């Protein structure tokens, strides 16, 4: 995160806060999109693309370190955000900006970096778990966001459950609105 912070000209705390806000917003929008067959089919098709096979995760250290954020990653992220947020990515960037204190441009760049990482992670999970249908991808996203039937929190849910109350949803809403739960 240090390199990404330097590349944006922002401090690490703001960059970390922006990533913490961006990831659940992206995952939540993807989960929402999978509630209809068209959205689920579109996401499954995108995850079949070699570009989203998980290989980006091998470069995560250098991407977050700032040395590998190139125009290709930003362009891929921009395209992903357009699909995931249905053209409303400025609203999402505003929420990330409000949560992190970053300016809109920096918040948008964080979203553009986070989106291909999320897609790479999902693509890798899809292949490893042999997910072939909309129910499977919805279950995967639900598990990541804490919507699974399991009693134990998923790893990402534990990370995203900022107040430790067992519910990620209130934390995601708080992240999106820039407020903290009292």
Question: Model regions: which residues?
Answer:
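A structural "flexibility-hinge" signal
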Residues: 1-182
């Amino acid at each position: 995160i240090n390199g990404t912070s330097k590349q944006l000209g922002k401090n690490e705390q703001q960059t970390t806060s922006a990533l913490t806000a961006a990831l659940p917003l992206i995952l939540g929008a993807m989960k929402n999109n999978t509630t209809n067959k068209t959205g689920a089919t579109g996401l499954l098709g995108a995850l079949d693309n070699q570009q989203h096979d998980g290989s980006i995760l091998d470069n995560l250290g250098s991407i977050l370190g700032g040395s590998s954020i190139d125009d290709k990653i930003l362009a891929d992220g921009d395209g992903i955000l357009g699909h995931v947020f249905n053209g409303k990515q400025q609203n999402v960037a505003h929420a990330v900006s409000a949560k992190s204190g970053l300016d809109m441009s920096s918040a948008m760049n964080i979203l553009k970096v986070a989106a291909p990482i999320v897609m790479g992670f999902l693509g890798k999970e899809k292949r490893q778990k042999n997910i072939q249908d909309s129910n499977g991808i919805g279950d995967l996203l639900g598990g990541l966001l804490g919507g699974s039937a399991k009693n134990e929190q998923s790893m990402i849910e534990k990370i995203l459950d900022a107040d430790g109350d067992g519910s990620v949803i209130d934390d995601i809403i708080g992240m999106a609105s820039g407020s903290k739960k009292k």
